[in-house]
């Protein structure tokens, strides 16, 4: 590849700030993410923060939201919106100790409406935290060595890793590398400590980078947009590695972790009214040994840092940089920065992106139990005090917890002699109810959406369980109750629940209206395609009745629902993301 080919640099970091989007100026002039956040927190007149600080606080893992259920009523009463904040914990690989769980339980009860939310990127979210509770909440996290740094914003977000780290030595090794990757890619500014822990500014952090900033890698303007990293261990693709900006697929040789296939340019966010936006699956470009992992992370991220679009944020993700510049050019530039060529990708096989629920024994003889947590919502339901039950398990459990990328929870590292005690708590609190659920429900996932997400156009978490209850009679009619089919719902097209790789997906368009997609790959290897646009519940159920019935009658042995939807002609196969909207 000829690296001397001229590429368009009119929209990247090489340009003056006044030629770029306003967020670039905001970041550059933010004093390394400090802004006036401290002053906004101290303002007693409003429940909100300054709009500029609201953007900067995302780098601190915090989103300003409001209760949309009462937004119109408060507007009629000429009151400010009911503002609160969501704080997202940085938890690489989803690993959580029992002491950390108990602290999060305490914070959820004190500051977040008696609930916790497990996310699709293996972490916790605390919703409805009031402005004056943010510092106490984040300082509480610090007590158990947790924080919310870089959980949002134009940085690396949370680093994912296939669970369960204790099932095998390879899983443990991959988790350790994912945790190191999270620290390696973390921004270095002291803003977080100063604002949330109220520490004095450390003079040693100033001018540690060539541009005089505190960020040797990121500089003053950080990344063009979010950048997601994930580690998958075949045959499980639970992290949806093809949906990551940078994915590492573990390659095992003679029972040991040898290295990783490198996949770049995944990302599922899109906008319905902007056809230039589309989901894209990551492209596998080669293989690196474990010893080259962090060098590879730096090389790939630096290409996006330097060449990503900083004019149009709808076009700023790495997937667009790759499609604009060309995959061959991007790969060659990565290799130039590495100083060596990537080896050919090694063979691997994925079989599923779902969670095996129930009990499994690890190589060391210890047990692990995966619990179904519907849509990741940890809360006390009538007849099923889930939050209380998990708190009780945390009190008696001697191992750890693992949050899965499907918003479920693993009680991990249970010694054989301790299993009866765990089973007793599970039975007492109804935590084993997943054993009677349909496979469709067990393979479902929804984003939070209303009432707290400002981007949601329709319900998601609060609606999907009810919709599944109306689909389940169809499954029973056609003998498909035990057939694993992935279904995912989001309240908008941005894709937080990774809907565009599901076999059935619904994305919100307006209250009660959704786009219906079919044909995603069972293990996340293929994008789905729109089947119906902007339809309500009755049309969704009628469509699924037709397709599920056809599937039950004419499927071939071992054929998955998504594969059938394409073979039967309900939707066309999407070969590349750029053709998703065709």
From Swiss-Prot:
4Fe-4S found in the keyword field: yes
Compositional bias of kind Basic and acidic residues: 1-12
Enzyme Commission (EC) number: 1.8.1.2
Reactions mediated catalytically: hydrogen sulfide + 3 NADP(+) + 3 H2O = sulfite + 3 NADPH + 4 H(+)
Cofactor(s) needed: siroheme; [4Fe-4S] cluster
Amino-acid positions noted as binding [4Fe-4S] cluster in the UniProt annotation, renumbered to this chain: 447, 453, 492, 496
Keyword Iron assigned: yes
GO molecular function terms listed in the Swiss-Prot or TrEMBL record: 4 iron, 4 sulfur cluster binding; heme binding; metal ion binding; NADP binding; sulfite reductase (ferredoxin) activity; sulfite reductase (NADPH) activity
One protein family per Pfam: NIR_SIR_ferr
Region called Disordered, residue ranges: 1-26
Ranges in a coiled coil: none
Biological processes, Gene Ontology terms: cysteine biosynthetic process; hydrogen sulfide biosynthetic process; sulfate assimilation
Residues annotated to bind siroheme: 496
Keyword terms of this UniProt record: 4Fe-4S, Amino-acid biosynthesis, Cysteine biosynthesis, Heme, Iron, Iron-sulfur, Metal-binding, NADP, Oxidoreductase
Role, per record: Component of the sulfite reductase complex that catalyzes the 6-electron reduction of sulfite to sulfide. This is one of several activities required for the biosynthesis of L-cysteine from sulfate.
Family affiliation: Belongs to the nitrite and sulfite reductase 4Fe-4S domain family.
NCBIfam families recorded: CysI, PRK13504.1
Protein name: Sulfite reductase [NADPH] hemoprotein beta-component
Organism of this sequence: Afipia carboxidovorans (strain ATCC 49405 / DSM 1227 / KCTC 32145 / OM5)
């Amino acid at each position: 590849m000829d690296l001397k080919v001229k590429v368009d640099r009119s929209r990247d970091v090489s340009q003056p700030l006044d030629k770029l989007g306003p967020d670039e100026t905001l970041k550059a002039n933010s004093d390394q993410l400090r802004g006036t956040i401290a002053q906004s927190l101290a303002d007693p007149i409003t429940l909100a923060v300054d709009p500029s600080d609201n953007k900067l606080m995302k780098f601190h893992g915090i989103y300003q939201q409001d209760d949309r259920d009462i937004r119109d009523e408060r507007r009629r009463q000429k009151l400010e919106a009911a503002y609160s904040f969501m704080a997202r914990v940085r938890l690489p690989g989803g690993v959580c100790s029992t002491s950390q769980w108990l602290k999060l339980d305490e914070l959820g009860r004190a500051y977040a409406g008696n609930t916790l939310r497990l996310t699709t990127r293996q972490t916790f979210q605390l919703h409805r935290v009031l402005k004056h509770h943010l510092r106490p909440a984040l300082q509480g996290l610090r007590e158990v060595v947790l924080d919310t740094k870089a959980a949002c914003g134009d940085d690396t977000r949370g680093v994912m890793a296939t669970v369960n780290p204790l099932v095998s030595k390879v899983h443990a090794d991959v988790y350790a590398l994912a945790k190191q990757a999270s620290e390696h890619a973390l921004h270095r500014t002291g803003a977080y400590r100063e604002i949330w822990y109220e520490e004095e500014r450390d003079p040693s952090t100033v001018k540690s980078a060539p541009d005089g900033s505190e960020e040797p890698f990121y500089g003053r303007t950080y990344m063009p947009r979010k950048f997601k990293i994930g580690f998958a261990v075949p045959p499980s693709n639970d992290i949806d590695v093809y949906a990551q900006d940078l994915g590492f697929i573990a390659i095992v040789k003679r029972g040991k972790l040898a290295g990783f296939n490198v996949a770049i340019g995944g990302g599922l966010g899109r906008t319905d009214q902007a056809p230039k936006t589309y989901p894209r699956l990551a492209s596998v470009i080669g293989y690196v040994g474990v010893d080259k992992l962090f060098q590879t992370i730096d090389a790939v991220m630096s290409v996006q840092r330097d060449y990503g679009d900083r004019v149009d944020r709808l076009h700023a993700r790495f997937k667009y940089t790759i499609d604009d510049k060309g995959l061959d050019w991007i790969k060659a530039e990565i290799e130039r920065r590495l100083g060596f060529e990537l080896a050919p990708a090694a063979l691997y096989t994925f079989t599923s992106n779902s969670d095996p629920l129930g009990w499994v024994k690890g190589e060391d003889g210890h047990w692990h139990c995966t619990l179904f947590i519907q849509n990741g919502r940890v809360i006390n339901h009538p007849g099923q005090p889930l939050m209380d039950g998990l708190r009780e398990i945390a009190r008696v459990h001697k191992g750890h917890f693992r949050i899965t990328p499907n918003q479920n929870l693993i009680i991990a590292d249970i010694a054989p002699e301790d299993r009866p005690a765990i089973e007793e708590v599970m039975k007492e609190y109804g935590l084993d109810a997943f054993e009677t659920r349909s496979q469709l429900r067990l393979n479902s996932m929804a984003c939070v959406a209303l009432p707290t997400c400002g981007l949601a156009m329709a319900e998601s978490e609060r609606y999907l369980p009810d919709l599944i209850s109306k689909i389940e009679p169809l499954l029973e009619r056609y003998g498909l109750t035990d057939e694993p089919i992935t279904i995912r719902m989001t309240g908008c097209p941005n894709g937080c629940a990774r809907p565009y790789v599901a076999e059935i997906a619904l994305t919100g368009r307006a209250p009660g209206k959704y786009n219906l997609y079919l044909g995603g790959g069972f293990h996340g290897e293929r994008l789905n395609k729109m089947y119906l646009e902007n339809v309500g519940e009755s049309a969704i159920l009628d469509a699924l009745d037709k397709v599920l019935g056809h599937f039950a009658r004419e499927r071939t042995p071992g054929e998955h629902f998504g594969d059938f939807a394409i073979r039967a002609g309900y939707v066309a196969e999407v070969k590349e993301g750029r053709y998703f909207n065709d």
